[in-house]
Curated annotation (Swiss-Prot):
This is Phosphoribosylaminoimidazole-succinocarboxamide synthase. One of its GO terms (molecular function) is ATP binding. InterPro entries: SAICAR_synt/ADE2_N, SAICAR_synth. The keyword Membrane does not apply. Its EC number is 6.3.2.6. It catalyses: 5-amino-1-(5-phospho-D-ribosyl)imidazole-4-carboxylate + L-aspartate + ATP = (2S)-2-[5-amino-1-(5-phospho-beta-D-ribosyl)imidazole-4-carboxamido]succinate + ADP + phosphate + 2 H(+). It holds the Pfam family SAICAR_synt.
Length: 277
């Protein structure tokens, strides 16, 4: 296998006509990779992605060829995939006002060019899910919000509309399935690319704790920060630590590592109904 790309969290290898996508235990916050891994994180993300790819297979095609035809040393954290020509846009759907979207709303009253009702509080449910794309920045740089018009300028009107529709369809169906299991999906990011036949196809990961914000429905209360089954716990620690959000990042304390892993395990078990390990 030939290493093609090493990203913040995933490594991509070429294996003949296919790709081998490997999820590491690395964790990134504020677009910087932290020096401390989260044990089994890569396997948890891979298992949850595969579950979602299966759940949403009739809604949108995905890049998975096999989860078992991979090198034995990578079993559980690698997927054999078809090659895609990736779209140069991060496709994000939001159902709740949180994170960077809430910060932008506080400053301007809009999110990615979409005007929202006045007086909304942190974590408020949006009137309907919205498409809030961003640029794809290199490792170490920050993604920047885009308006839909900017996406049109980058990829054309027809493709931009398809990106928006697929992203929102995936979010709505994912949110519906998660709600049945007591989980709210606040927002999610998906990667889309063109397959060899020109079909827009989901790649990378899907609806995981790295690409989404998951909240327990039973404790949801707008107007405050939510308990989150994702890397928000690490983000919060990084914010409190006094780190300037530039490399090199500090080591993550053991208690933060353990609590983060527990959240990844909990949401996997709640969503899939399967025991981890």
């Amino acid at each position: 296998m030939e290493l093609l790309h090493s990203g913040k969290v995933r490594d991509v290898y070429a294996d003949g006509d296919d790709l081998i996508l490997v999820a590491s235990d690395r964790v990134s916050v504020y677009d910087v990779v932290l020096p401390t891994p989260i044990p089994e994180k890569g396997k948890l993300l891979t298992a949850l992605s595969l579950w979602w790819f299966d759940q949403l297979a009739e809604l949108v095609p995905n890049h998975v060829l096999s989860a078992t035809d991979v090198p034995v040393e990578l079993a559980g954290r690698a997927i054999r995939c078809r090659r895609l020509e990736m779209v140069p846009v991060e496709c994000v759907a939001r159902g709740y006002l949180v994170g960077g979207g809430f910060a932008e709303y506080q400053r301007t009253g809009v999110v990615s060019g979409i005007e929202l009702p006045r007086g909304m509080v942190e974590a408020a449910a949006l009137p309907e899910p919205i498409f809030t794309p961003s640029t794809k920045a290199p490792v170490g740089e920050h993604d920047q919000p885009m308006t839909f018009g900017e996406v049109v300028d980058k990829v054309g009107a027809e493709t931009a509309e398809r990106l928006r529709q697929i992203t929102l369809d995936v979010y709505r169906r994912g949110a519906e399935l998660a709600a049945d299991r007591g989980i709210l999906i606040a927002d999610t990011k998906i990667e889309l690319g063109w397959a060899a036949d020109g079909t827009l196809t989901v790649g990378d990961e899907l609806l995981t704790s790295d690409s989404s914000r998951f909240w327990p429905a039973e404790s949801y209360q707008p107007g405050r920060a939510q308990f989150s089954y994702d890397k928000q716990y690490v983000r919060d620690w990084a914010t409190r630590s006094g780190w300037d959000r530039r490399s090199p990042a500090p080591e993550v304390p053991d208690e933060v590592v353990d609590a983060t892993r527990a959240r990844y395990v909990d949401v996997y078990e709640r969503l899939t109904g399967e025991r981890w390990g």
